[in-house]
Amino acid sequence: MNKKTESKEQKRSFRSAIVLAGGRGRRMGMVEKALLEFERKTILERLLENLFRVVDEVILSVRDNSQKEKLFPVLDKFPDREIRFCFDSLEDAGPLEGIRAGLLESRSENSFVCAGDMPFVNPEIVDLLFEKASGHDAAIPRWEERMFEPLHAVYSKKMLPEIEKAFERGKHSVLAPVFQMQDVVFVEVSEIREFDPELRTFVNINTVEDLENMIGHAKEKVGL
């Protein structure tokens, strides 16, 4: 670690990450996507390794105790890291409920949020989003077509009352409370490409084909 990096880490505040692992993997036969293996590591293990390069705690947002028990063995690989679980209070409320539960559990003002099936989350991008979010309500990647990456973003606890209001209106989209917050920073994907040209940080695994493509891409990289 060079002196510049060390100085930067000493100055930064405590950071949390919320991993939304509560999805049922319906498009993959109801499997726990976070436990799928890729290059001898589960997706969750790979994700945690990347996150702990830039955060101090990780909160795993899960459906219930049954899912917690399935994921728990992965935590044995991180004995010196702070990893906790939180649970949805509302059924079938989607990822927005996972974000709400995670923000309530988080020890920091700002938390990075991502899905549990994203094996290539880039620590440099996470670091960038935390920096952009500092002093603001949120920092969210934005594409040129005005599409967003709300499940790869940093949110402050100021989002909590807006989530409650969204639920009261019957809205479960993650963007519903986002657009009600007053001070959201949108980070252009063109800026993110400077750190991650292929934008692999946004890759998630929804189908068997996604997993096969990911494995095929890795083989091409090593010339197999």
From Swiss-Prot:
UniProt-recorded Gene Ontology molecular function terms: GTP binding; metal ion binding; molybdenum cofactor guanylyltransferase activity
Enzyme category, top tier: transferase
InterPro entries: MobA-like_NTP_Trfase, Molybde_CF_guanTrfase, Nucleotide-diphossugar_trans
UniProt subcellular location: Cytoplasm
Catalytic activity: Mo-molybdopterin + GTP + H(+) = Mo-molybdopterin guanine dinucleotide + diphosphate
Domain notes: The N-terminal domain determines nucleotide recognition and specific binding, while the C-terminal domain determines the specific binding to the target protein.
Protein name: Probable molybdenum cofactor guanylyltransferase
Source organism (scientific name): Methanosarcina mazei (strain ATCC BAA-159 / DSM 3647 / Goe1 / Go1 / JCM 11833 / OCM 88) (Methanosarcina frisia)
